UniProtKB/Swiss-Prot annotation:
Chain ranges of the Exonuclease domain: 21-186
Active site per UniProt: Y143
Enzyme class (EC, first level): hydrolase
Summary of the function given for this chain in its UniProt record: 3'-to-5' exoribonuclease specific for small oligoribonucleotides.
CDD domains: Orn
Main location, first listed in the record: cytoplasm
One CC-aspect GO term: cytoplasm
Subcellular location: Cytoplasm
UniProt family annotation: Belongs to the oligoribonuclease family.
InterPro entries, A to Z: Exonuclease_RNaseT/DNA_pol3, Oligoribonuclease, RNaseH-like_sf, RNaseH_sf
Pfam assignment, any one: RNase_T
Encoding gene per record: orn
Species annotation: Corynebacterium efficiens (strain DSM 44549 / YS-314 / AJ 12310 / JCM 11189 / NBRC 100395)
EC number: 3.1.15.-
Protein name, per record: Oligoribonuclease
Amino acid sequence: MSETVGNGENFPAVAARDDRLVWVDLEMTGLDLERHVIVEVAALVTDANLNILGEGVDLVVHATDEELARMDDFVTRMHDSSGLTPLIRASTVSLKDAEDAVLALIEEHCDPAHPAPLAGNSIATDRAFIREQMPRLDAALHYRMVDVSSVKELARRWCPRVYYKQPTKGLAHRALADIVESIRELDYYRRSFFVADPGPTSAQCEADAETSVARFAHYLE
């Protein structure tokens, strides 16, 4: 019997492999699709309850000196500060290698007959680069996306205490850490925001933030 996700109501059960989320975060040399390239790819798959499945993908992609020279001052400082730039120069991983690795992760955990949505924080730019530079990956993902930043903006307007008590981000500007922090943030919103009116107290928000931080702490060590 196939694994299913129960709902406690008289609705059709959903097979677990049909209910995955594919979390992808990219680091690029900039935001211009015509001039800039992907230099780091990280991916994780979660089930419907945000449990991380498997080891995921965390790869630095090689870029030429010419491609790196197209970075503006802000991106140059960011990648230098995070330690990414020397890793890019030393990497022997191609963008195709990284795309293949993410596709293998999806094949392992997801049902290809039911493409999973792309998930992340402010993922429109990531999706644009995926569409342009990793078209096979784009084709393997559902057209729908789960953008945690949309939930953040709603929380800021509808329940400010939830917004202001969210777990603090490390701002490492490295792809895998960014993904785990996005999953953690959505886990927090699930606990504190998607509840009946009048919503949680500030103390409950703080407790929910601590629970979400503890749940994902070992991924960020």
